[in-house]
């Protein structure tokens, strides 16, 4: 015979399990939490989660004792999800969001507090986006400078991968938080992106309203892992989702120098054993981007490309615009049209990488392909985009390898200039360096005339930065073309080294184009470098 006490205890345990199960069944999506930032007007923010199929869900937005709005929906099967779109809100806060599920006589309530409305930016890419504030120049000062930016909120996605597209995140490294020295400087390549944080901080300085920053990055990853299968198929990328394509990560290695003093002329950095960053196609799109599709966004900033220097490099000019188009379509559809169809997409053009040999490791080509082979953005294949040139921000002494330069402040500053111009429509703002608008061969004088679209400052004249393609007997080779003279918007190259026909010209076509902020051509403010370019010569003077 069973005694009454154990039976009663078992019954209580069963009731407890049922109660907890019912509570767990009704929840917000993983990224809806205290301290979050929701997208402000003119878009409506999406609030969604999971519940019991057939139940009614009422979402209430409150400020203090005042009810701002209520939205009612139901839980849809078989996904067991519910979703509402809030009316567009002006920037500000704080607010409380309450969701109540009603099924027959049972009510369950969820609350999140200290919610702000502002602009939400998603930051993604590989290790240069993943680097934290702890790893950059002036880290101590940057980490102590958070008190004035409590309306810039941060969120970080866990490093997870999936074979199929997930509806919700499988893990969160850092829930929505106010910035602190602890969560910004948690460790190396963990928690919060330095570029993302600094970009948001610069935006806040300009806009003076809340900014939400979502970091979803993983070092040592090619673009294929961040792309949907549909996007890759559109570019003819072989489907290798069942294979692991090993990618080299970069680490520093001494080359006959016993110290880090400047007397050491150089160090070389060589690929080491592959790191944990996945290379199976689409697995990070599935696990770290697709689950965010219902989040209403202002835009995206991206820093990636190093791992494609020797992997599907020639397809990058197709894959990158396809990734942008795919993300835009998914986020627009996922939040019922609240995220703009062609939302602003900013990116960092690859920085420098110190090599011992003459090989360029594919960096010049990737920089070019990052612009869909146009040399600048926005362009017809990449509308509503902006780019931060970073090839002049080299860092030969970086403890993380020269491929990981520590000046992320300048990167973020240049990115925010692009955002102000492209995403926010600020007029009369110079946000990119000089671009050649006319290239003319002056045959009689053996000179090449480059006319730029803005005033230029030539910071150095050498015989390496500009090169010409010299053709003779059906063979062409690149030769140096020293700067002869220059004026406010014009630069003239000496072609005397070419005894044949000059067919093309290129600028800064190397992995390490210059020393820190010492490339040849800048805007007159000295803040924005001219991007690298290559061009055929079609105008020939007399």
Curated annotation (Swiss-Prot):
Tagged with keyword Hydrolase: yes
Q: What is its main location?
A: other
Q: Which reaction does it catalyse?
A: N-acetyl-9-O-acetylneuraminate + H2O = N-acetylneuraminate + acetate + H(+); an Ac-O-9-sialoglycoconjugate + H2O = a sialoglycoconjugate + acetate + H(+)
Subunit-structure text = Disulfide-linked heterodimer of a small subunit and a large subunit.
Q: Which UniProt keywords apply?
A: Disulfide bond, Glycoprotein, Hydrolase, Lysosome, Serine esterase, Signal
Official protein name in the record: Sialate O-acetylesterase
> Modified after translation how?
The two subunits are derived from a single precursor by proteolytic cleavage.
Lineage here is: Eukaryota, Metazoa, Chordata, Craniata, Vertebrata
The compartments listed are: Lysosome
Expression (tissue specificity)? Widely expressed.
What is this protein for, i.e. what is its function?
Catalyzes the removal of O-acetyl ester groups from position 9 of the free diacetylated sialate N-acetyl-9-O-acetylneuraminate (Neu5,9Ac2) in the cytosol and of the diacetylated sialate residues of sialylglycoconjugates in the lysosomes. Together with the sialate-O-acetyltransferase they regulate the balance of acetylated sialoglycoconjugates, key players in various processes such as cell-cell interactions, host-pathogen recognition, and tumor antigenicity.
Q: What class of enzyme is it?
A: hydrolase
